[in-house]
Amino acid sequence: MYTNKQIWSVSFPILLSLLAQNVINVTDTALLGHVSEVALGASAMGGLFYICVFTIAFGFSTGSQIVIARRNGEGRYSDVGPVMIQGVMFLFVMALLLFGFTKAFGGNIMRLLVSSESIYEGTMEFLDWRIYGFFFSFINVMFRALYIGITRTKVLTVNAIVMALTNVVLDYALIFGKFGLPEMGIKGAAIASVLAEASSILFFVIYTYLTVDLKKYGLNRLRTFDPALLMRILSISCFTMLQYFLSMATWFVFFVAVERLGQRELAIANIVRSIYVVLLIPVNALATTTNSLVSNAIGAGGIQHVMPLINKIARFSFFIMLGLVAVSALFPQFLLSIYTSEAALITESVPSVYVICFAMLIASVANVVFNGISGTGNTQAALLLETITIIIYGSYIVFIGMWLKAPIEICFTIEIVYYSLLLITSYIYLKKAKWQNKKI
């Protein structure tokens, strides 16, 4: 079984890469928080729409990563490249289609969901530029799948730093009009994010060409479209695509409900969500590691090590989160002051931070256990569990947010409900279901 050192050697670079990537999220939120509440709220709605679409590609890459990790564990290294190449081709076509769809219907969709005219206008100003990122981010996730699948994760850290630095500099320059560039506000934030994603893909291409044994991994020649291979990948990926989309779509429903409570509540939700995402970074890194190591272990014939491996990573994740939550709960005002200097907004956001801190303790275990299921290749079961949980999530937020119009901190209790259900259903599945013989 994998040692703590081996687990950490895979997960730590992923953690650093996620940390650097989330500099983009924090930077956008923090800088726009100093522009206006409308800009902050509009970037939240536009950003969530973008992420909902992006998660379809991310779900495909996660399924591809499972296949790549299984081939790597089996020692079938030359079969890794074809999975990567077919994935890139598929996602580029998907980027074209989703870009066209958003251009044609994005405005109509947002008009139905956003009640405030000023928020709507800001959201569309952001989205009109942000969706160009599809062409870069969709390809980036396949490089991520490749390197996690073959457990060469250190490159992800460097790549994320390149992307984060590009975004921070361009965000500051384009939002506020520095370094001789025009002041563009929320539009500048969108353009900065797109250019940061472009810098990321440029780095990945150069790094892969210079450092990877292209022949060993079957990356030394381009291949024609292979429908049979793509269908094998999709037999795993289609479930993760739908799973991730549904998961993010419920976040979007959450923000739609909050937007109807008012601009102040939407601003609070965006700030607290940013803190929430940062707290989740080590959990997501360890969950991704679980996914890859479980698939590698099964590929190498180590099915008996799967449950002990998941339990070990889950304990690791919980104790890391315990430390982060302690700091966050003791100093919430300091964290909130990064995003806004308005004293009243900080004070009103503190209760929501406490709620999220409690939810994160459950999430630290739930995400690891749930990703263990995906790592076995049983992505259809993972989708079913996620769907059950999401139906309850959606019903809860519609009831307390849209019907009762409860305070924002009460709305955030949905995260406690969500992760509790996810943990219980995932644990029961791994204990009771027959997942050991899944072939991919």
Describe the predicted segments one by one.
Residues 1-11, 68-135, 181-238, 294-359, ...:
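Short alpha-helical transmembrane segments in multi-pass integral membrane proteins
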Residues 2-30, 34-35, 51-63, 67, ...:
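N-terminal transmembrane alpha-helices
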Residues 9-28, 129, 163, 196-200, ...:
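Transmembrane helical elements of multi-pass membrane transporters/channels
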Residues 14, 18, 30, 66, ...:
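Transmembrane alpha-helix boundary and packing residues in multipass membrane permease domains
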Residues 19, 23-41, 110-117, 173-184, ...:
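Helix-terminus/linker motif at the lipid-water interface of multi-pass membrane proteins
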Residues 21, 25-32, 54-61, 65, ...:
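Alpha-helical transmembrane segments and their lipid-water interface positions
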Residues 40-100, 137-151, 155-156, 268-332, ...:
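Small-residue-rich hydrophobic transmembrane alpha-helices
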Residues 61, 65, 130-149, 156-164, ...:
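Short runs within selected transmembrane alpha-helices of multi-pass transporters and secretion channels
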